[in-house]
């Protein structure tokens, strides 16, 4: 079983160079100057790799599943997990509460949420990419991702990426925007008053028994001062470098945590209701949950079950979760032009 999927992936792997190349790696080169440069580190990659498990048992694997590689926007799903830790600890009691109110109630300055447009923005708005947050985060303006198109959104803008777009009210417009997720990450770090990689390690990765090869990098300028300490904020992807570097095997553990509704070895690491909310369709963008792609109306893959959900990143990073059949498939460095075909072959395996 799954041999057809593995063979198809091997025949359609990412065509990027193995060493970082400004001409093809990342998204930053598509940005308008002066923001078309790296702010964080990038790392050489390995060949295509991946692993497929059912009920936590590995069914098939290929490549080096223990090599830690950049995950790009798959990082967003891990940032949503860290937000789940904040919910579990009572730091966030209402995801519909404005971020500014949540921070200020705890005596934390609500940097970036002070003005009339940004004050009503809630945690939910940020998690669903409907915030319309406006400003600069570590020197990069939200405008840089205005009119941005990503491959899995159902409709595409005909405007030029980075062209100034009239802002809507928070919660009324969906846009995939890496500046806004970085602002979310910064607000979450302020709430914990700890660097998020430390939170992720303590509450998720170590309890899962993950390796110590993963690392989550910030930017050269993403430090803030808090109570006399320097804390580095981390991004939700690799748009300007940085982000999560992790092995396919560790990603499998995280995927299994998701399909097991936040439970690992009898321990509830993330609230079950949080896992459910991550998979709940956004009212105005039903293909998206909390930093998670959904197969609502089979918009991502006609071949896979509708309850499937995904974490995705450029360079052919894809994690497919099927919570009904308890399937987790981690695919690294596939040719993104063939993502639909690869998922189609996987769908054939599910249907048997």
Predicted regions and their residues:
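Active-site SXXK
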Residues: 56, 70-95, 126, 184-188, ...
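Active-site-proximal binding-pocket segments
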Residues: 200-201, 205-279
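N-terminal leader/targeting segments and the immediately adjacent pre-domain N-terminus
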Residues: 1-65, 72, 89-93, 190, ...
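Short active-site loop at a secondary-structure junction
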Residues: 38-51, 61-102, 106, 117, ...
């Amino acid at each position: 079983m799954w041999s057809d999927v593995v063979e198809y992936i091997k025949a359609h792997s990412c065509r990027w160079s193995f060493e970082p190349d400004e001409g093809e790696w990342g998204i930053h080169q598509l940005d308008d100057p002066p923001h078309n440069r790296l702010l964080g580190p990038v790392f050489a990659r390995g060949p295509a790799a991946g692993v497929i498990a059912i009920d936590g048992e590995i069914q098939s694997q290929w490549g080096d599943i223990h090599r830690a590689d950049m995950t790009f926007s798959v990082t967003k799903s891990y940032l949503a997990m860290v937000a789940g830790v904040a919910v579990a600890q009572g730091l966030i009691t209402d995801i519909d509460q404005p971020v500014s109110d949540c921070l200020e109630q705890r005596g934390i300055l609500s940097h970036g949420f002070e003005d009339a447009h940004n004050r009503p923005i809630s945690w939910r708005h940020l998690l669903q990419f409907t915030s319309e947050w406006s400003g600069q985060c570590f020197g990069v303006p939200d405008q840089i991702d205005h009119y941005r198109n990503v491959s899995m959104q159902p409709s595409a803008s005909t405007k030029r990426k980075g062209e100034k777009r009239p802002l809507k009210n928070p919660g009324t417009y969906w846009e995939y925007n890496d500046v806004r997720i970085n602002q979310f990450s910064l607000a979450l770090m302020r709430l914990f008053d700890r660097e998020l990689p430390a939170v992720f390690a303590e509450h998720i990765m170590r309890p899962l028994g993950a390796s110590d090869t993963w690392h989550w990098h910030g930017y050269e300028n993403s430090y803030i001062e808090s109570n006399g300490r320097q804390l580095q904020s981390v991004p939700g992807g690799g748009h300007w470098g940085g982000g999560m570097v992790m092995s396919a095997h560790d990603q499998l553990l995280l995927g299994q945590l998701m399909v097991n509704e936040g439970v690992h070895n009898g321990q509830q690491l993330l609230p079950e209701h949080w896992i459910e909310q991550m998979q709940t369709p956004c009212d105005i963008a039903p293909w998206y949950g909390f930093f998670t792609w959904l197969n609502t109306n089979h918009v991502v893959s006609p071949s896979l079950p509708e309850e499937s959900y995904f974490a995705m990143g450029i360079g052919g990073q894809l994690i497919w979760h099927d919570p009904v059949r308890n399937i987790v498939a981690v695919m690294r460095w596939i040719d993104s032009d063939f993502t639909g075909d690869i998922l189609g072959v996987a769908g054939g395996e599910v249907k048997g």
